[in-house]
Curated annotation (Swiss-Prot):
The lineage of its organism: Bacteria, Bacillati, Actinomycetota, Actinomycetes, Mycobacteriales. The active site is at H134, K138. (S)-2,3,4,5-tetrahydrodipicolinate binds at H135, G144, T145. InterPro entries: DapB_C (IPR022663), DapB_N (IPR000846), DapB_N_CS (IPR022664), DHDPR_bac (IPR023940), NAD(P)-bd_dom_sf (IPR036291). It is found in: Cytoplasm. Its EC number is 1.17.1.8. One of its GO terms (cellular component) is cytosol. PANTHER family: 4-HYDROXY-TETRAHYDRODIPICOLINATE REDUCTASE 1, CHLOROPLASTIC-RELATED (PTHR20836:SF0), DIHYDRODIPICOLINATE REDUCTASE (PTHR20836). NAD(+) binds at G9, A10, R11, G12, K13, V14, G77, T78, T79, A104, P105, N106, F107. This is 4-hydroxy-tetrahydrodipicolinate reductase. Keywords: Amino-acid biosynthesis, Cytoplasm, Diaminopimelate biosynthesis, Lysine biosynthesis, NAD, NADP, Oxidoreductase. One of its GO terms (molecular function) is 4-hydroxy-tetrahydrodipicolinate reductase. It catalyses: (S)-2,3,4,5-tetrahydrodipicolinate + NAD(+) + H2O = (2S,4S)-4-hydroxy-2,3,4,5-tetrahydrodipicolinate + NADH + H(+); (S)-2,3,4,5-tetrahydrodipicolinate + NADP(+) + H2O = (2S,4S)-4-hydroxy-2,3,4,5-tetrahydrodipicolinate + NADPH + H(+). Pathway: Amino-acid biosynthesis; L-lysine biosynthesis via DAP pathway; (S)-tetrahydrodipicolinate from L-aspartate: step 4/4.
Length: 248
């Protein structure tokens, strides 16, 4: 039995890649392609079961509210989710307990693994910094992936009793040392020619470790998205991150 899939942000670069991947999958049927200016009611009219959202932080909450209220599962790659937004989504889902929502900062399998590797390495090194690099049209900084990575690193270091990275900086230009995410410095680069890239730099006495992931094409997101589409109907409520779907 095929799953009826809709895509929000269908005319965007990622959206186009996801539409192509859904069309190529034997067990999925692309029934709705919706973008800016199109009616969300298209999903109810076409009997869409799962919607993939790659839109913009400014509109994603309205999209999700509509989908949850209509019992449509959602797989969300749009970034900009903080704790308050996630709690709001949980509130909507409480009134629609059979509906599932997956929100992931990154759907590239390698990126998900790199976040897990960084979490595992965090307690063994004195210093750590995160550098994320993206195309110049990205709306948010730091990226959702970098924000999530820094949070996982900070939690792992706190559990292990590891203190903040040493830093004797006493004067700096505003922003020169990057953003502080739970005690982990995060730096954002925006450069034409890039897609999505991240480095986590660890250092301690006598050695360094670099964990790097590169998405060189937006098709790298498709396997993770399709996994989410296939599984979200079995997981009511809110899932944050692709990790549970990969048994990590």
């Amino acid at each position: 039995m095929t799953i009826r899939v809709g895509v929000l942000g269908a005319r965007g670069k990622v959206g186009q890649a996801i539409c192509a991947a859904v069309r190529a999958a034997d067990d999925l049927e692309l029934v709705a392609e919706v973008d800016k200016g199109d009616a969300l009611e298209t999903f109810t009219e076409t009997g869409t079961e799962v919607v993939v959202d790659f839109t913009h932080p400014d509109v994603v909450m309205g999209n999700l509210k509509f989908l949850v209220e209509h019992g449509i599962h959602a797989v969300v790659g749009t970034t900009g989710f903080d704790a308050a937004r996630l709690d709001e989504v949980r509130g909507w889902l409480a009134a629609s307990p059979a509906t599932g929502v997956l929100i992931a900062p990154n759907f590239a399998i390698g990126a998900v693994l790199s976040m897990r590797f960084a979490e595992q390495a965090a307690r063994f090194f004195e210093s750590v910094e995160v550098i994320e690099l993206h195309h110049p049209n990205k709306a948010d900084a730091p990226s959702g992936t970098a924000y999530r990575t820094a949070g996982l690193i900070a939690e792992a270091r706190n559990r292990a009793g590891v203190g903040r990275s040493p830093d004797a900086t006493s004067t700096e230009l505003d922003g020169a040392r990057g953003a502080d995410v739970d005690g982990v410095r995060v730096h954002s680069v925006r450069l034409a020619g890039l897609v999505a890239h991240q480095e986590v730099l660890f250092g301690t006495q006598g050695e360094t470790l670099t964990i790097r992931h590169d998405s060189i094409d937006r098709s790298s997101f498709a396997p993770g998205v399709l996994l989410g589409v296939r599984e979200i109907g079995k997981r009511p409520g809110l899932t944050v991150g692709l990790d549970p779907f990969l048994d990590l």
